[in-house]
Amino acid sequence: MTIPDLTAKVVLVDIEGTTTSISFVHEVLFPYAKQNAEHYLLETWETDATKQIVQDLQLLPQFAEYASTLGTQPAVDAQLIAGFVRYLIERDLKVTPLKTLQGLIWAKGYASGQLRGHVYEDVATAFHTWREAGLRIAVYSSGSVAAQKLIFQHSIAGDLLPHLSAHFDTHVGHKQQTESYTKISQILQVEPQHVLFLTDVPLEAAAARAAGMLTILLQRPGNVPLSEEERSSYPVVEDFVALHTLKQP
């Protein structure tokens, strides 16, 4: 499908596969969280934040499933919870307490300089161009809001956080549910037809479209190839350069 002459008041961007390479998330961020989970939990075990995360992790249905694989009734300690964190990450389960913990672990990595957020080279220019045109830019990702901010604040293109006016994660709802996008429109106080959602996942695009949003699919290097049906159902771009002419209605 060709790119229409688009107008929008808000550009809502996904992160993984849209502003940031999938490989950065899966080959850098996830392994970093797996490798550093136990150390972080040991360091912060007595803090209120970690206690809450540990409690929330144990309430997940997957926890009983994981514990049953260990053979005995294990003590709930940093080693056990770190093992469960690795279990969840290996299964790519996007559950909120895991995302919260990952965000805290990554925060230490960014602060130490061990991590820098990947963004595609066209992202910073597009953000600047859209802001100059008077558009707001918001982020909706399955990663926690804290983790989102870290990627853009400590990005390889510099601090991009000032360009972003709002952040949404799974607290607002899952990304393949129409209600999530309706709620985002309400929070942004803008009609859904004035929101352009950019993502690499057709099922997310379908949910956003059902809520009344404009949608465009990204076919970045390393993304899952789009089918002919998906390409005929949605406008598709390879980068943000084609969207520099985006303007307000």
Swiss-Prot record:
Pfam families for this protein: Hydrolase
InterPro entries referenced in this protein's UniProt entry, alphabetically: Enolase-ppase_E1 (IPR023943), ENOPH1_eukaryotes (IPR027511), HAD-like_sf (IPR036412), HAD-SF_hydro_IA (IPR006439), HAD_sf (IPR023214)
EC number: 3.1.3.77
Cofactor(s), names only, from the UniProt record: Mg(2+)
Keywords: Amino-acid biosynthesis, Cytoplasm, Hydrolase, Magnesium, Metal-binding, Methionine biosynthesis, Nucleus
Protein function: Bifunctional enzyme that catalyzes the enolization of 2,3-diketo-5-methylthiopentyl-1-phosphate (DK-MTP-1-P) into the intermediate 2-hydroxy-3-keto-5-methylthiopentenyl-1-phosphate (HK-MTPenyl-1-P), which is then dephosphorylated to form the acireductone 1,2-dihydroxy-3-keto-5-methylthiopentene (DHK-MTPene).
Subunit structure: Monomer.
NCBIfam families to which the protein is assigned, alphabetical: enolase-ppase
Designated name of the protein: Enolase-phosphatase E1
